[in-house]
Every structure is written in C-alpha cells, then in structure tokens.
Regions:
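Alpha/beta-hydrolase-fold enzymes
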Residues: 86-175
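Conserved alpha/beta-hydrolase
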Residues: 30-45
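Serine-hydrolase catalytic-loop signature spanning alpha/beta hydrolases and amidase-signature enzymes
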Residues: 16-18, 36
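The serine-hydrolase catalytic nucleophile loop
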Residues: 19-26
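Conserved acidic catalytic loop of the alpha/beta-hydrolase fold
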Residues: 46, 58-75, 88
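Short, small-residue-biased leader/transition segments that mark boundaries at the very start
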Residues: 2-5
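Gly/Ala-rich beta-loop-alpha elbow adjacent to hydrolase catalytic centers
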Residues: 79-84
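Short beta-strand element of the alpha/beta-hydrolase
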Residues: 7-14
C-alpha cells in the first residue's frame, strides 16, 4: 500500500448544488491505485446570505488551498465538468507565483473555450438573454433553509439537465 499512497489524486467536483456522490464510481476506481481526495461543497441553500457571495475568485482560491493543504508533490488534479475553469485558473496562478504545482491536471468534460465544439447548452446560451436566465433558472432559497433569500441556480435543475441530455446512461448507472 505504501506505493499506492505516493500517488495522490484530488478530484474537484462540480459545485452546482449536487454532491460529490455523483462521482462515486470514479472515486471507487481511483482508490485501487491512489490516495483520493475529493471536494464536497456546502449546498448554497445552507449558507446564510449574511456570509456574503461566492464567486469565481473564491472558487479558484479554494482549489489553491486544497492543493496547498494536500501538497503538490505527487498530486494529480482531476476536475470534472464545471470546475475545469477554476481549476485551470488555480493551478495557473500557483505556477505564476512560483509555487509548487501538481504533477498533472486532468480536465474532464468542462468547457475551457465553449466556442469550440458547441453543444445544445451553448446554443441555448446564445439564443436566450441574460435576463431570461435570471428569470427562468435563478431562484431564491425558500425560508425553511438557513440560506433563505440567497439567489441560486438549484442543483436539481442542473441534475435534471444532465439526465435529459443522456437519460439512458443515467438509468443504467442506477439500475
């Protein structure tokens, strides 16, 4: 087992309201040969509005902190979908500051340049205005949660979108 734990992986999971459990098969596979770390973000509905906003800069900073905490030596970072851009930013900023950087950075399924190989999501983004998205996919957290009033893109919408794009794969992965 000693050699296994020399190889470390940080999986940077998506932030958008669902949990890292969606990556359990990836983690299970990587655990055979690596010490695995994975991010699991607090659902925004549980963060009081008084805690302030959370933006791209914060996301990048957290990824940097994870890398520093684990240690970049023998670390491989895998970002899955949404966090590819913040992960690229975090590692690039570490490098530009002369800090240690991971041995590798693997970006899976994330749009670094969404203009290349556009998808149905890109087409929707080009067809609809910013105001349309604000009024159709951004909701206030209900009063029953600590984050009441916080404006969020709910994870259930993201997850439903994933299922709608490839229903057969999702059905097979759970049955």
């Amino acid at each position: 087992l000693g050699d296994v734990y020399k190889r470390q992986v940080l999986i940077v999971a998506p932030l958008s309201g669902h949990h890292a459990t969606l990556l359990r098969d990836t983690v299970r596979t990587l655990l055979q040969d690596h010490k695995v770390y994975i991010t699991d973000w607090i659902d925004a509905r549980n963060v009081p509005v008084s805690e302030g906003e959370f933006g791209l800069d914060d996301y990048v900073h957290y990824v940097q902190e994870f890398i520093r905490f684990i240690g970049a030596e023998n670390l491989h970072v895998i970002s899955v979908c949404q966090p590819t851009v913040p992960t690229l930013g975090a590692i690039s900023l570490l490098a530009s500051a002369g800090e240690a950087t991971p041995a590798s950075m693997i970006m899976m399924g994330g749009p670094i340049d969404a203009r290349k190989s556009p998808t149905a999501v890109n087409n929707l983004a080009e067809q609809k205005s910013h105001d349309w998205f604000e009024s159709h996919v951004i909701y206030k957290v209900p009063p029953t949660y600590p984050g009441a009033g916080r404006r969020v893109y709910p994870g259930f919408l993201q997850h439903t979108g994933f299922i709608a794009m490839n229903p057969q794969n999702h059905l097979q992965s759970h049955w």
